[in-house]
Design a protein with these regions (language model features):
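Beta-strand signatures of extracellular beta-sandwich domains
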Residues: 49-51, 91
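Beta-strand cores of secreted/periplasmic/IMS beta-sandwich domains, seen most often
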Residues: 39-40, 195
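Short proline/glycine-enriched turn/loop motifs at strand-loop junctions of beta-rich domains
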Residues: 41-48, 83
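Substrate-binding/active-site clefts of carbohydrate-active enzymes
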Residues: 152-320
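Solvent-exposed serine/threonine-rich low-complexity stretches and specific carbohydrate-binding patches
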Residues: 61-70
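The feature marks proteins involved in alpha-glucan
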Residues: 1-33, 69-175
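Structural beta-strand segments of beta-rich domains
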Residues: 34-38
């Protein structure tokens, strides 16, 4: 580990352009059964810590571990045991104050409501045949027949004939019909000759409380929370980090098998919130465009907009 004196002092980073970029592939978790290495890019933090939990919600952390700084704007710690099935958050201290916990900005698996990141065995997320799955060949752009859909809207009707209503798995069911005998769901898309499915946001967003799905809270998903994790309300078990990923993959595999390519709508230009966003809880201010008076720019019309002109924001979007 680098000595703390080599870490860029927060008070020296008076311009976003001075924040040291980090392009390593180990952000934010590198897992093996033998050890997990956590690496957080937080160049303005004075301290950071890792909180390890046994569950995705509630309770106190089983461990709180101080992370060690490096001279590239990152903080690191290695845990020398198998953490599969555990959950974790990061926290940073800035200007003498510990900010709220965050799963980080690059979490790929989370617990319910996306508040804690999860350590999982990625092999468990692969449905049978996933390794050989390929999108259907596209020969000419003029052949495209595009169909846009929202996961919940597409299958939620009581008379849709679909068992997994409002879920990723709805797009894996065949032989479904309406009471009038018309094809529904996936069979309806095939009837139309659709070649491409454009799916409204599929990734973890903030509006729907995944512990209260009976409330039928609705949103299109344009309020992103965790960009790299499938939305839990579209899973049959939002509390299980593996389930939401495996079911998302099953959906993609099913669409490919039925001759359709998948286009994913991802909302990179703004986030659901600002002050409690994972971006601002990790590197405060950096990921958002601001006006001259320090207020947040709002060209998105959603209260904030991400600063894609900054190096690590661009890098984040490309890598995500």
């Amino acid at each position: 580990m680098e000595n703390i004196k080599n870490h860029p002092a927060p008070d020296q980073l008076d311009s976003f352009d001075k924040y040291p970029p980090y392009y390593g592939q180990d952000l934010e978790l590198a897992y093996t059964p033998q050890r997990s290495v956590f690496t957080l890019w937080a160049p303005t933090a004075s301290k950071t810590r890792l909180n390890i939990y046994s569950s995705g919600e509630g309770g106190n952390p089983e461990e709180q571990l101080e992370m060690e700084p490096s001279d590239d704007g990152t903080w690191r710690i290695a845990v020398e045991r198998d953490l599969n099935g555990s959950f974790y958050t990061f926290q940073i201290e800035k200007e003498g104050k510990w900010l709220a916990e965050t799963p980080g900005i690059l979490a790929k698996a989370v617990g319910i409501n996306g508040d804690r990141a999860a350590v999982i065995d990625w092999n468990q997320t692969n449905p049978e045949g996933w390794e050989s799955d390929r999108a259907p060949e596209l020969k000419m752009y003029s052949d495209i027949i595009l169909y846009e859909l929202h996961h919940r809207d597409f299958s939620i009707a009581p008379d849709s004939g679909i068992r997994n209503k409002g879920k990723f798995l709805a797009l894996t069911e065949t032989g479904t019909k309406t009471p009038e005998g018309q094809a529904s769901g996936l069979d309806h898309l095939k009837e139309l000759g659709v070649t491409h499915i454009h799916i409204l946001p599929s990734f973890d967003y903030g509006t729907v409380d995944e512990t209260r799905l009976a409330d039928k809270t609705y949103n299109w998903g344009y309020d992103p929370k965790n960009y790299n994790v499938p939305e839990g309300s579209y899973s049959t078990d939002p509390a299980n980090p593996v389930t939401r990923i495996r079911e998302f993959k099953e959906m993609v595999k099913s669409l490919h098998r039925n001759g359709m390519r998948v286009v994913l709508d991802v909302v990179y230009n703004h986030t659901a919130s600002v002050d409690r966003s994972n971006f601002n809880l990790t590197v405060p201010g950096y990921f958002y465009r601001q006006n001259a008076d320090g207020s947040y720019s709002d060209a998105s019309g959603c209260g904030n907009e991400t600063a894609s002109e900054r190096e690590m924001v661009r890098h984040y979007i490309v890598e995500s």
